[in-house]
Amino acid sequence: MVYIMGFEGSANKLGIGIVKDDGTILSNIRHTFITPPGEGFLPKDTAKHHRSFILSLVEKSLEESKLKPSDIDCLAYTKGPGMGPPLRSVAVTVRMLSQLWDRPIVAVNHCIAHIEMGRLITGAVDPTILYVSGGNTQVISYSLKKYRIFGETIDIAVGNCLDRFARVIQIPNDPSPGYNIEQLAKKGKNLIELPYITKGMDVSFSGILSSIEGMVKNKQNKTQHSVEDLCYSLQEHLFSMLVETAERALAHCGQNEVLAVGGVGCNQRLQEMIQQMISQRNGKSFAIDERYCIDNGAMIAWAGYLIFKNGTTTPLSQTTTTQRFRTDQVDVTWRD
């Protein structure tokens, strides 16, 4: 029986999780750094938040799982991609605990962790993956020991687009900007025309963001658009672009399953649009709820276990972090 403790801190969510080798999630504690409306989270402030809470989350995670440090077989942490200072703050703590508890370390790619957690929770076998979050937007499929990127954003991530629009309209960041936009969008009735940019399987979101920001700033000129209609229209355009590129990837790869992962993946409207598309192809769509879609420690623990079970660990001298760590850089040794 193997127990892995996972540490996630690539952005504003700090997560500690413990997973057993059969996929049982024993604990999944998370604490989010939330800023006032209209503000984003700076790397140095986020890192300070992580340093302040990480040890208490480790204690809570052990308590919830009813385990002792001596029961933990390996420590897994997010190597990247993500924000530099928060990543480093978590990595330093993991190195300290590794030496204190005399346990090996496994470095994990954040994107791979999202994918493998999605496969674990849903039972999806070989899906086309729509990975949508605050820092990443990619259409991915597995082939020849790699998770290969067939399409991605050429500028900003979809979650970043939503977050930045939330700042413009000054809505709360609690529990998250994207969630609050989703709730406002449900009240929208009028679809406003916005830029729609897909290039093959790639997408671009900077133009649509610039356009809708301009509409908000022109409200003093008595524009007729309500905040609800703006949120509704933004979501409809963004998600239509994502679903279109995902469908192209499905056709290209000859697959009939779609798995949505990442923080934006728990948006109910996006899930609904994916389901509408895949049902026309007689396929299946898979999605997970906010416990595992949003950044969390359990996903790092599970991805760490998949690496660890093959006998691979990361030497202490190589437990570094990197802000740029692409999904297709990782050798997926645990899949056929």
Curated annotation (Swiss-Prot):
UniProt GO molecular function: metal ion binding; N(6)-L-threonylcarbamoyladenine synthase activity
Keyword Aminoacyl-tRNA synthetase carried by entry: no
GO cellular component: cytoplasm; EKC/KEOPS complex; nucleus
Cofactor binding, note field: Binds 1 divalent metal cation per subunit.
Enzyme Commission number: 2.3.1.234
Gene3D superfamilies linked: 3.30.420.40
Signal peptide: none
GO biological process: tRNA threonylcarbamoyladenosine modification
Protein name listed in UniProt: Probable tRNA N6-adenosine threonylcarbamoyltransferase
Organism expressing this protein natively: Dictyostelium discoideum (Social amoeba)
